[in-house]
């Protein structure tokens, strides 16, 4: 008996084809020392699908890695910010400023899909030049099966981790009897973030978790050794905390960061391996923090705004819109050396919502920004339209706008006289601006429906193509991906 064959091709605007695996993935933890030598510390296997990592690089120095087989063929390539570089942004003064610090050593992780051909990883440093650092062979390296499990609180869960951007909080300096304070602090930051556009519009695309890691002592370290401690010179305190956070690092009073990065990665790998964005909240009201591999901030009243500003860097890859220095200058969605209104990258927004071509302050006045009062410049204002647009595009670079589709097989064989159903479960934005249209053999058959039912008797015997196209027609985006 002849049958009709329907091939489903689920096509989405912003779909990105990437290398991945259904066999799980490994989290490899590496250390890079003061001479840029890299060593492998641990590997942990995760039995779930690895989604693409598209977190943006936003500093001038990065580490490029290549996974190769034993024929020296590259099967996977990636790039991360140089983990030794952290930055401190000071919004306490009228004019924000940024200070860069290079750590003596740092830890970082690479999530690698399982591939039986994987043989070695090569590391390169890219900071204007391109220099090979070293290579490490995976052969005979044992997977670390030890786990240290902590409670994980669901702050906001909108779907499976594999189809969401997962924000994970770690707390430092919270004792066991202060975990309710920690969760409350995290909820405050999460609530502030998702009441901020465009995160409020795309809230359903995110999950938020808090790992409850108790410290021996409450608080953090402030040795009062930085020359800029000012009125805090006599305010000396120490605390035995799980991630060893401290002020006064690298002689900057307000530079607050965790010194045991290795422990932080172990906690993440053991308890929430699907993390995409990491926030570390330190239990002190004193102003401070730093950005880098970890976004670290205190319980100061500005912490929520600092966290939202920082996610603009780490998630959306946005530049600061105050002049941070030539180390941070470059071509970004919201920064350019081009001041031609016809060709500038935010041309589609020009002169709407106060979007213009504004020179940075001297000596960076040959670099331009789109707005004069954006959250990437000051704490408090909303993101400008250019930053909103690029944040939305960053969401779609990581995720497809669906939870699931059916049938799961992309090739379906049915008798010529039967009925067959196709459907998708979309991830809706707020307000919903998704359009879901269905096509058979490139002919539109249904508009704005999550599913269709086809009577195969209406089609000739043989092969037909069923296609669903999901598009986001939000007016917050004017430039397609």
Residue ranges and their predicted role:
Residues 64-86, 144-267:
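Propeptide-to-catalytic entry region of secreted or membrane-anchored zinc metalloproteases
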Residues 219-222, 261-297:
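Catalytic zinc-binding patch centered on the HExxH motif and its immediate surroundings
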Residues 304-321:
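Active-site recognition of the HExxH zinc-binding catalytic motif
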Residues 179-182, 287-308:
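Short pre-active-site segment immediately N-terminal to the catalytic Zn-binding motif
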Residues 21-148:
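Extracellular glycoprotein-like low-complexity segments
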Residues 450-463:
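Solvent-exposed segments in extracellular or luminal domains encompassing
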Residues 117-119, 462-467:
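Exposed beta-strand face motif in extracellular beta-rich ectodomains
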